[in-house]
Design a protein with these regions (language model features):
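Intrinsically disordered or low-complexity boundary/linker segments at protein termini
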Residues: 27, 42-84, 91, 180-204
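Active-site phosphate/pyrophosphate- and oxyanion-stabilizing loops and adjacent acidic/basic residues
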Residues: 43, 86, 118, 144, ...
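Short, well-ordered secondary-structure micro-motifs
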Residues: 35-36, 66, 81, 107-111, ...
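Flexible loop residues that form catalytic
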Residues: 28, 73, 104, 160
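Redox- and metal-dependent alpha/beta enzyme cores, enriched for Fe-S-associated oxidoreductases
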Residues: 79-125
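Charged helix-capping and loop-helix junction motifs
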Residues: 38-41, 112-116, 169-175
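Hydrophobic alpha-helical segments and helix pairs
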Residues: 7-8, 13-59
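Structural beta-alpha unit
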Residues: 1-23, 124-175, 180, 184, ...
Length: 204
């Protein structure tokens, strides 16, 4: 057990002491109050953890990963997170879908995607990657609907220093947020602090 006045500080302290490669948080939503408490803990860990954080819904049933969605802003830091993600996906030969949701006022989405695809191709040889550019003024709702439509096994995001995409996701009402993404596991990397998963990648 972790004895600490702050749940977050206690978890982070132990993770650092043990040099943990990941933190796994279970999410059991028995009532609305518990949703808020658990959601607050998980959300705070995203920005303070020394390693990647997994948020796992209580009713998750183990199955080999087949479809992984990485919610991207098509920025350089995404490259390094995706490279770590590919190491994890490689033993399963899972498909990584790099999804960007652009608003109707954002005219550079397609240009960014082409640049990012070329950049990623130089840095990573993993074969099972595809790109999706979605248009919507309601980023959270569109992402949730996409996850439902495509039967996704894992959602991956990058916690950035300037927040950006993940802030747009987490900024919404806490209960609604938990209800939305707690249907599938969520993995969050921190910018400049994503770790390798210690798999032996074959990049097939």
């Amino acid at each position: 057990p972790v004895a600490h006045t702050s749940i977050i500080k206690g978890i982070v302290s132990k993770a650092m002491d043990w040099q943990a490669f990941a933190i796994f948080m279970g999410m059991k939503m028995e009532n609305k109050l518990r949703e808020v408490i658990v959601g607050s803990t998980v959300g705070s860990l995203f920005g303070t953890s020394p390693c990647p954080v997994w948020a796992i819904p209580s009713d998750t049933v183990y199955a080999p990963l087949e479809t992984i969605v990485y919610a991207s802003d098509f920025e350089e830091e995404d490259i390094y997170a995706i490279r770590s993600l590919a190491e994890m996906a490689s033993p399963f030969r899972a498909e990584i879908r790099i999804v960007h949701i652009a608003t109707e006022k954002e005219f550079t989405g397609a240009v960014q995607m082409d640049w990012f695809r070329e950049f990623l191709g130089k840095e990573l040889s993993y074969k099972h990657i595809r790109f999706e550019l979605l248009l919507s003024n309601h980023i959270q709702n569109r992402l949730v609907s996409y996850l439902k439509e495509e039967d996704v096994d894992l959602l991956v995001m990058l916690e950035r220093e300037n927040k950006s995409f993940l802030e747009k996701w987490l900024r919404t009402d806490m209960v609604n947020k938990m209800e939305s993404y707690a249907k599938i596991p969520l993995l969050v990397f921190r910018e400049h602090n994503h770790q390798v998963f210690y798999f032996a990648p074959s990049y097939e």
